[in-house]
Amino acid sequence: YNEEDVKKAAQMINESERPIVYFGGGVRSAAGCQPLRDLLEKTGMPATYTLMAAGVLSYGEPHNLGLLGMHGCYAANKAIDEADLVIAVGTRFSDRVALNPDSFAKRAKIIQIDIDPSELGKNVDVDLSLTGDASYILQAILPYVKKTEHKLWMEQIRGWQKNDYKPVDSDTELKPHQIIDEICNQAGPEAVYVTDVGQHQMWAAQYLHHTKSRGFLTSGGLGTMGFGYGAAIGAQMALGRDARVVMLTGDGSFHMNLNEACTAVSYDLPIITVIFNNQVLGMVRQWQTTFYEKRYSDTDPHRKTDFVKLAEGFGAKGYRAATPAEFKAAFADAMKQKGPSWIDCRIGKDEKVLPMIPGGGTVNDIIME
């Protein structure tokens, strides 16, 4: 990038009335969390992010609209649709975000910032591209942008947020969002959260409220099931045994690499594994329910694994929970353990990740129930 492009980007930001920052894992890789936050605070722009950037901004920050894309927030997707300027930082406009490239941010000019020049304008046409480290470019832009608040734009977005999907609590059944809320309440903002791949991964990205910068580890892009336990072990070893590491997984993903429990037990690593056990391959099954008239194929493996006995066989501590009260008690006890523990959370096989925008669709096609 050069100084003229930096000044042009700043000018486009200064002249826009409805700007939004859309950022991805490149911001995390570039250690660009604080430069991004500085830009948002000075300009008053809202921001939304991809799965790979979850945790870069904390959940309660006023500029944070939440996750974007197929399973993203209604308000975030609507804001992209209505924006007059999109600043895309460290992201590639994947098919989980730009579900319909021809309709993506159709009212907006687009600035794309990426370290890889081959990504610039590859999936979506852009008006200005800057090649380089996201952290340095954001810092370079900052002196040239005006301090503003975009009050009218933010008021409009707050109105859309009233229509964001709101899950319903239950006292008798274990709901995914309640599991994650309880994890947040007990493990807190200093914990490192790791996921496998599947529905639980999306629920984690949607509902983990306390993640700190670089405190959310997940496998996006390739979406490799079985990633979680090995990643959790790596995080625990890197941070030390006194750190809190929580691994969220599904029964499908966990079956693919649960042999890693041998390593966790051998080294007495106090990793808490929370298994979202719906006894199906839930993400694919959700697609079959929604788009293929409930023609289920290869998503119900009819497993009868007893995770509590399996944990004990490995030398870990095992729990089972079917209600919010049972999960609260199990997680509290797991927090006291000196070695690895697993909590088998029994959830319904028809639980869905919502909202959902179908592939090729737009925010106008969003499914809320």
Could you tell me what each predicted segment is?
Residues 45-52, 111-114, 271-276:
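Short internal beta-strands
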Residues 97, 324-369:
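Glycine/aspartate-rich loop-and-adjacent alpha/beta segment that forms the canonical ThDP
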Residues 82-83, 137, 289-330:
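Conserved thiamine diphosphate
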Residues 158-238, 355:
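Active-site diphosphate/adenylate-binding microenvironment
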Residues 1-15:
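Conformationally flexible catalytic loops at phosphate/diphosphate-handling active centers
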Residues 75-94, 202-281:
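Thiamine diphosphate
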Residues 126-138, 259-277, 356-358:
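A short alpha/beta connector and helix-capping loop motif
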Residues 53-156:
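Glycine-rich, acidic loop regions that bind phosphate or pyrophosphate groups
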